[in-house]
Amino acid sequence: MSEHHFVFVHGAGHGGWCWYKLANSLRDNGHKATCIDLKGAGINPTDPNTVSSLDDYDEPLYAFLSQLPNDQKVILVSHSVGGGSMTAAMCLFPSKVSLAVYVAAAMVKPGTLIPERLKNVMKICSGLIEEETEKIWDFTFGNGPQNLPTSIMMKPEYVRDKFYNESPMEDYTLATTLLRPAPVMAFIGIMDIPGAPETDKIPRVYVKTGKDHLFEPVLQEVMLALWPPAHTFLLPDSDHSAFFSQPQELYQFLLQAASSLSP
């Protein structure tokens, strides 16, 4: 069996900690696993309200990829809005990435305008339509109420249903002690990633989550239609957080995707 190096990119509010089951399974079977904390996430000490852009947020991921030897490539795996961070990294370091796996993740082709259809579906699924925003999300206005919010965090009463509706209770309980506010400016940047032709040469895989209450299946299908990946997998009983709700099935999908790479 060939050894692969998987690098995991978390979504909003989460950190490298959310991938612990996948990292453990991969390491137990001879692979490498690196779980990145983006700036202001996980145990990264930065205040998320001070993160100024997507590139600022992604700096730990960029730093990791930049120090890889020229003859080494990794498999990037992202979750939720972490898909935008992964896409940005692919644009900057295409020679370091052998495969990109989007797990219920934002997948938008860089350098293209996001169609209104996708924007509208994204807003509806995430609860960011105007009448739902303050119901589901808490905002911090670090630069004053007259300016855009600096961070966003899901209200505790919605976390179970939106993130972990099919996940074990113990993982949900753990997550509620670790979730952090997420930087708004980073997510605005996801909508405007410059194009990079080399990115299209990186094979992409999408893992759909059938019982996802945040990135609902309709949103996933719209993204797949707009930028079709090489392969698609389905976890029919997974919530938004497949790393908790169906970790073994996701692990098998990762190995299957990795096996498609040339030796």
From Swiss-Prot:
It catalyses: methyl (indol-3-yl)acetate + H2O = (indol-3-yl)acetate + methanol + H(+). Keywords: Hydrolase. One of its GO terms (molecular function) is methyl indole-3-acetate esterase activity. Pathway: Plant hormone biosynthesis. This is Methylesterase 18. Transmembrane segments: none annotated. Belongs to the AB hydrolase superfamily. Methylesterase family. The gene is MES18. Its EC number is 3.1.1.-. The active site is at S80 (acyl-ester intermediate), D212 (charge relay system), H240 (charge relay system). Pfam families: Abhydrolase_6. The keyword Glycoprotein does not apply. The keyword Transport does not apply. Methylesterase shown to have methyl indole-3-acetic acid (MeIAA) esterase activity in vitro.
